[in-house]
Structure formats: C-alpha cells, structure tokens
C-alpha cells in the first residue's frame, strides 16, 4: 500500500475515534468550589480515593460539572493566578458532547472543576477555510495549547476534517483564562494535495529568553514541524509559511513504525536547553512519549544517543508508556503531554490515560517530572497526590519493590495494526539492607539521596530518583523511583 494511503487511513481512523463530539456549545459558570490547596499541599473535604479509573456514573453530558479529571484528552495546563487551568480536546465517553475546547481548573492538581468551553461554536475562520477547500469541518476541536504573552492569554487550537490532511491551527485571545475568547486568525494550514507537509494539528509554542516565539506542530504525514511566529500577534511571522520538519521517526518496509504527533516544547533554563516531547504510536493503545533536546529552538534536537531527531529512526528516551503494576489492569494511551511548572519551580507532566479494562475512558493523569543530573527528564510512575519533596532515608529503601523497565516492541502501522497496548508489566525485586538486589534484577545498590544507583549483575547500571509518592493501585502512601539505565531505557519502581 502506498505510504500516503497509510497516512490517510491514520487520519480517517483518528477522526473516527473522536467522532463522539457534536455541535453547539456555550460558556457556563464555574462549578462551586471550596478547595483551598496548592500543588504540594493536602486539601480538606475531599477523598482522593473517590477518583476512579472508570466513570460511568458521571459520563452523561448532564453531569459535565462533575467530570473533574474525566473525559480529558490532549490537555494543555498552565498556572494562572491561583489556579492551574486545563484546556483539552472535545471528547466524551459514550456520549455526544459540545465542541469548543473544554476548560477545567484546579488549585492542587488533584481536584479539578469543570469551567466551560472556550468557544460557543466552531471558530469561523477555521471552518470557512476547510469549507473553501471542499471539506466539511469536524464538529470538534483538538489539542489546544495555552500560554500568556504580556497581559494577553493565547490559545492555539486545531480544527480538522474527514478529508485527509485538511486541517488548520488557529489562534484565539482573551484578557482572562476564563475568557471570553476572540478569534485572531489562522496560524498555519494544510491541505489534501500532493505537497510534502505534515498535518496542521497539535500546536505547542516556546518563547526564548530573547522573546522569540516558535510553534511546533504536526501529525503523521511528515513528522513534526517548526514555524517562526510574530510574538506581537502570535500568528506566523511570514503569512502562509508552513515551516520546516524538525523531527521524524523510523520506518519498516516503507511504513511508519507508528504515528508521530502531539509535540510539547519547553525551555529549561537550568540546563539552557529546549526539550521536545513527542507522542509515538496509536492514541488508544501504544501511545508513548519520547524526548529530544537542543541548544537552540530551531534545533538540531538530539536524542539520548546524540542522533538528530529528524533522522528516520525511533528515538529515545521513552519516558512513559503503557504500564501495569500488580493488582491493577494497567494504563494505556498515555501520551500527548503537557509539561508545566508550579510556583516553586517544580515540573509536572500531564496527559490522558486510558484504563486497560476499558480503553474508551479517558482520565487526566498529572505526575511529577524530575531531571537527571545529565539533563534528561523522567516522570513519576505514579500520579501526583500532594506528596512532599522531603528526601527519603536509606533505611526506608530496604524491602520489596515492583520494578518496570519501559521496553518497546515495534509494530508498524496505526489503529488496525497496533491493537495490543504492549503493557510494560512490573516484576518483583528486593533491595536488601546489605546492598544487594534480588528478584527480577540481580546486582547491588547504593544510595546518596535522592539518587539510587543499581549495578546489574552481568552488566548495566541504573540511576534512579527516589521520591515520596502514592500507590494508586493499592490506595496508600509509598516510595517511588524513576530514572534511566545506561542505555537510555526508563526504569520505574514503587515499594510494596
């Protein structure tokens, strides 16, 4: 099958997965709230155990004010004032929901309240462009990106269509994160023709220390693109410019090893580098996140092995992927992330996750993100739950653990081919007080808080960040670790 036909199948299938979204919408008043916490602190009058993996009881549209962390896909989160605001794709479990970009907010990253929608209908400029090109716009907006420039709030959105690659990325602005939002214009478009270009969806933006701005976008057809913006308007610096490709992935027998999309870009001042997070594979099953980094926003972005992200290979590290701890069905479809800061400078990683018992549910997962000493990001194996940042003592580490090495199997293709989520399953290991490791891994361990070093018998080393955490599978406090081994494979663990 020609490669472009594979891409078209991917686009059509993606539309089908999100086809639960339909017409009309309006701004609603925020849900009442008596929350008073902040990230890193506990709150009152809320039972964290009430957060379920599936949510049939609140799925009906009439209960949208109770959705909280449910029905979330492709979130973009930023802290504005007292609240973290989350803007996300128009989706709903088993129902028809209104389009317009869903808005939620939280004071503590655990309790979320549904606020409303950005738009009361499909943005006129984007819908008109698609209609002018002979298409019919989807009744859904996808993958927003939110930011603040000066006193202006900017929200980039994607509007696509059943016509392959006929899509737009538009910009709306507001004086408040609650809106009202007004269209400013189209930033970049893509069409169903014979040109070489990626699909104009999945925007993300970085502002350099000098004030320059760049938009990164794309899905399938031709990888991830970068486009220079005019910081004064948020639109393309050169009208009609599509930008250039900056990241790609591998092929097998002329077929992509899976989708590449859902980029997130940040600048990390402590390391002076730009980090590009990219979603690989099918969104309902094998979805996982890769990271590359660069000294300049225009690249080249390099992977763990120093290979240019624009090379036709699959890049590492893969910092999160479908996984399963003991006593739980597992989580899959866990990528297209947002990376953001709290007021104390701590980083967080958030995305949707789908419970493997029924992957049609879509839950918001927020996790702490940590930095290795050599500048690579790693994420917690468990969701954030108000845990503090106190150092864990060496005596606390001895005992029984579950360990997951995030390995990967290539399955070229999209939804039809990538049916198996390839859950990475935990294995038991024991850290003995005498410094030995036994179980699924044999070797020795040493600890200098917060770093746990494991030397594997037969070769290989692991450097792991140790942190307090919550065992969500067993609903109790625990200790977690996350890090990379010497080959760039992510390694997770939690104490039993």
Q: What are these regions, as identified by a protein language model?
A:
Residues 10-12, 18, 42:
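N-terminal leader/targeting signatures
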Residues 13-14, 69:
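N-terminal amphipathic alpha-helix initiation
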Residues 18-19, 300:
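Alpha-helical transmembrane segments and their juxtamembrane interfaces
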Residues 27-496:
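Carbohydrate-active catalytic/glycan-binding domains of CAZyme proteins
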């Amino acid at each position: 099958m020609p490669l472009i036909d594979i891409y078209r199948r991917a686009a059509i299938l993606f539309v089908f997965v999100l086809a639960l979204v339909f017409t009309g919408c309006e701004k609603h008043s925020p849900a009442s709230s008596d929350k008073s916490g902040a990230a890193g602190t506990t709150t009152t009058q809320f039972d964290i155990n009430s957060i379920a993996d599936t949510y049939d009881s609140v799925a009906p549209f009439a209960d949208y004010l109770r959705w909280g962390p449910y029905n979330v896909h492709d979130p973009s989160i930023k802290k504005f004032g007292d609240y973290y605001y989350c803007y996300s794709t128009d989706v709903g479990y088993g129902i028809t929901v209104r389009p317009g970009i869903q808005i939620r907010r939280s004071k503590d990253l655990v309790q979320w309240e549904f606020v409303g929608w950005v738009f009361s209908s499909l943005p006129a400029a984007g819908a008109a462009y698609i209609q002018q090109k002979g298409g019919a716009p989807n009744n859904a907006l996808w993958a927003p990106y939110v930011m603040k420039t000066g006193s202006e709030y900017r929200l980039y959105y994607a509007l696509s269509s059943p016509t392959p690659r006929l899509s737009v990325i538009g910009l709306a602005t507001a004086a408040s994160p609650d809106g009202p939002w007004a269209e400013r214009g189209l930033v970049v478009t893509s069409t169903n023709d014979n040109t070489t270009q990626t699909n104009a969806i999945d925007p993300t933006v970085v502002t350099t220390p000098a004030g320059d701005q760049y938009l990164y976008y794309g899905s399938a057809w031709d990888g991830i693109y970068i486009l220079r913006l005019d910081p004064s308007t948020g639109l393309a610096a050169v009208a009609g410019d599509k930008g250039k490709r900056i990241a790609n992935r591998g092929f097998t027998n002329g077929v992509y090893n899976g989708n590449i999309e859902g980029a997130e870009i940040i600048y990390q001042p402590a390391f002076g580098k730009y980090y590009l997070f990219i979603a690989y594979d099918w969104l309902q099953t094998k979805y996982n996140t890769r990271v590359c980094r660069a000294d300049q926003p225009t690249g080249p972005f390099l992977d763990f092995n120093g290979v240019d992200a624009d090379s036709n290979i699959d890049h590492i590290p893969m910092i999160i992927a479908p996984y399963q701890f003991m006593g739980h069905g597992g989580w899959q479809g866990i990528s297209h992330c947002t990376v953001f800061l709290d007021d104390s400078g701590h980083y967080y990683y958030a995305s949707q996750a789908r419970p493997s018992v029924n992957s049609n549910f879509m839950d918001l997962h927020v996790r702490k993100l940590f930095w290795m000493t050599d500048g690579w990001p790693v994420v917690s194996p468990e969701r954030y739950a108000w845990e503090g940042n106190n150092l864990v003592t060496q005596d606390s580490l001895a005992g029984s653990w579950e360990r997951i090495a995030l390995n990967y199997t290539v399955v070229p293709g999209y939804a039809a081919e990538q049916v198996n989520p390839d859950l990475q399953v935990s294995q038991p290991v024991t850290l003995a007080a005498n410094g030995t490791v036994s179980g699924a891994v044999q070797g020795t361990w040493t600890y200098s808080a917060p770093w746990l070093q494991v030397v594997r018998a037969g070769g290989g080393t692991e450097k792991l960040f140790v942190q307090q955490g919550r065992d969500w599978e067993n609903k109790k406090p625990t200790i977690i670790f996350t890090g990379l081994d010497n080959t760039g494979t992510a390694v997770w663990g939690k104490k039993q």
